[in-house]
C-alpha cells in the first residue's frame, strides 16, 4: 500500500547525491529566502562536484549580497572556494547589453556584431529576452560546469526563463527557414554598416550553432535526470498559494519538481513560555505546515529555521547550508 510508505527524507540530500543533475532551479515568491537557499545548495554541491556555477537571474542580484562579493555577467570564483563560481544576469536585458565575451569567435571573421544580431531578432516579438538567456546558456555550456544552480527572480520571470528554449527554438527556426531569402538583404545590411568580415553565411552559422545548443538545453530541461526545480516558500497563505501555482506550471512545462523548502520557521520549545507574538506565529505556521504535508506528501519537504542574524558571507552560508542536508533541530 502506498499509504504505508515512509515519508521522504526532509532534506536536499537527494539532489546533492544525484550525480546526473546538470541544471537546478531555485524559485518561489519574493521575500522567502530563495537566494540564501540557492547559495546554500551551491555550497553543498561544491563539496561533491568538480565545478559548480550559481547564476542569479533576479534583477536585485542578491547573491552578491549573500556572499558579500561583487559578481558580474561573467562567471567569477567565489571567495573561499576553489570550485564554486557565480554570475549575475539581468533578465530584462537584451542582446545589446551582454558583454563582448559572449560574441567572440576564434578570429575577426567569425565575430558577429551584437548590433546585427539585435536587428535580426527585433522582428520576432518576445524573443529578445529569450535570446539573451540563450547566449548566456551557450557560454555556460561551453565552460562545462558539473552543475548549474539558478537563483531565479519571482515566479513570472522564472516561468519565462524555463520556457526560453522553446521561444528561441521557434524564433530561430523561423529565421533559418527564411535564411535563403534573407541572405542577399543581410549581406547588403552588414555591408552598409561597414562590416565586410560579417556575411550572411556567418550569421546563418551563428544561428545554426545557437539553435543546436538551445535544442540540447531544451531536451535537458525536460529530462528529470538532468534538471529539477526546488520551490522555496514560507508557512503563510500567499506563499503556499504561489508555490502550488508554480508546481502546476512547472508540471505543465514538463519540468521535474519534487523538493520544497519551507523557510523562516519558528522552532519553539513548547515546554517554555513564549511571547504572545511568537506563539501566534507558531500556531499559524503549524496550520500551513499541515497543509503542506497533505499537498506534498510525495515531495521532499525541507524545513529551515528563522534565525536571529542574517545569513551573509561565505562562512555564514557554509554553516547554514548544513541545514539542507541534516534536518534542523533547535538547541536544547
Swiss-Prot record:
Keywords: ATP-binding, Cytoplasm, Endoplasmic reticulum, Hydrolase, Metal-binding, Nucleotide-binding, Transport, Zinc
Single Gene Ontology MF annotation: ATP hydrolysis activity
EC number: 3.6.-.-
Binding site for Zn(2+): 275, 278
InterPro entries, per the entry: Anion-transp_ATPase-like_dom, ATPase_ArsA/GET3, ATPase_ArsA/GET3_euk, P-loop_NTPase
List of residues binding ATP: 29-36, 236, 263
GO annotation (BP), single: tail-anchored membrane protein insertion into ER membrane
Active site: 58
Record bears the keyword Kinase: no
A GO cellular component entry from the record: GET complex
Major subcellular location class: cytoplasm
Catalytic EC class: hydrolase
ATP-binding in keyword set: yes
Subcellular location: Cytoplasm; Endoplasmic reticulum
Homology family: Belongs to the arsA ATPase family.
PANTHER family associated with the record: ARSENICAL PUMP-DRIVING ATPASE ARSENITE-TRANSLOCATING ATPASE, ATPASE GET3
Subunit structure: Homodimer.
Function: ATPase required for the post-translational delivery of tail-anchored (TA) proteins to the endoplasmic reticulum. Recognizes and selectively binds the transmembrane domain of TA proteins in the cytosol. This complex then targets to the endoplasmic reticulum by membrane-bound receptors, where the tail-anchored protein is released for insertion. This process is regulated by ATP binding and hydrolysis. ATP binding drives the homodimer towards the closed dimer state, facilitating recognition of newly synthesized TA membrane proteins. ATP hydrolysis is required for insertion.
NCBIfam families hit by this protein: GET3_arsA_TRC40
Protein name: ATPase ASNA1 homolog
Taxonomic path: Eukaryota, Metazoa, Ecdysozoa, Arthropoda, Hexapoda
